[in-house]
């Protein structure tokens, strides 16, 4: 059974990528027999190069993606060096799951409603400046992409913090800090000169994922990014949506260019990391041993901004009349909720079906692969984890869409479900990898020595211990599925609509109230499942059940016996 699950995982995650790669390469060379293009050429590449603003879009993409990643990594390190192994770190860990639960699109809509020229932030400033008209400066769709950079950095910092948990525990940071402080280094100097050179290489894969996402993001860039020019990923997406199907080679060339761009930037980052850590090492030994780095209150800011979006979305969804610079709507109404209620039910049902199916299948695959690793000592190839997280979604899905067009029949629903499984699986696997590695195998070995079968030992001993992690990983898979925009749009071909696809399309419209309604519902669903997973994991904790079954004692003194129970 484990072998079958392992093979199925490799098949589902790798096999469809072959026709996808072939589809995008053939399209880029203008070979699309379905459209009557039977002579390969490079017209698509020439059309892409000749498009006005394509070079500026590439430059903007590199600037926003790289800057957002560097900002997120810097904030993550500053938070770690100030909060790790302190009383405040427990609060940081507790808030990570709710922060990760909020989808990027819902956060982007709330960010836009807060930092727009007539948003809540500028309304608050107007109370003191008495400005009667909205401000001209804004962080939403600004020409330099600063709003997009800030939003991406805020959203990706919790992910890097979560990935740092297992890394720092493996590094035994407490021992490193104790040894460094015995040599005269204070806390900040020890973190910068001793911990950082070891932490950064171990965080390479999560940083790659954040960097690739920042370079290729479409949905958040459509809401918060500049439009003249837009980022290159948004430009390729616009080319793909061109009603003239003969322009598909241009979009395919853009998808390949986006892939090459991501690969090039990741390679440059790897080179710079190598030089900083392994070649240019003077900064690790020279300089002052006592200095202080900021970061004490950074996590509060990272946590407050996303949760500030919830009341912003809530108020906007009920606002009927809200003139600038009023801090509160003059009239409230449920009109927009009533207007969209029927659509919301249908879209929420579609999102739930896709999320439940993809998260459950991804969870089964992840558990199967981890058990296969424990039993046969053969890990899942890193390529299976890396492809969905590091390669731009446009570059993968475009070719698969072309391949689907060449198949007889309707394959939109299975293809969409497959795409959701593909992109949810790495996050579910990574969420379970740490608990599986930390599980003490001697527990199941003891159960086997007492006569239980391997299956019964797993269900009765191991499952109760790892069940909280399984529930949280399942919630992570649901959250990832709820956030998928491009897989649903590309492979669903407009036949499958979800809360995310509708929220993105409405966010570019003029009615902020309807956008707030969809953004609020999209943020609410993952929070519900994360809350359910947290509550269920507490009840499923075996320590809780053991404590509940233990006999009650009247006083704490009964736990300490001064005399033996037998009579002398």
Residue spans of the language-model regions?
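Membrane-water interface segments at the C-terminal ends of transmembrane alpha-helices
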Residues: 2-33, 49-169, 198, 202-219, ...
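Glycine-rich helix-loop "coupling/hinge" segments at transmembrane-helix boundaries
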Residues: 34, 38, 219-246, 325-330, ...
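A short amphipathic helical element positioned immediately N-terminal to and/or at the very start
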Residues: 40-50, 332-341
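Amphipathic alpha-helical segments in well-structured domains
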Residues: 42, 55, 92-95, 176, ...
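Short helix-to-coil transition segments within interhelical loops
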Residues: 86, 169-173, 178-199, 439, ...
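Membrane-interface capping segments at transmembrane-helix boundaries
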Residues: 171-174, 270-279, 439-442, 534-547
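Short, highly charged, low-complexity non-transmembrane loops/tails of multi-pass membrane proteins
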Residues: 181, 281-284, 448-450, 544-559
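Flexible interhelical linker loops that connect adjacent transmembrane helices
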Residues: 272-301
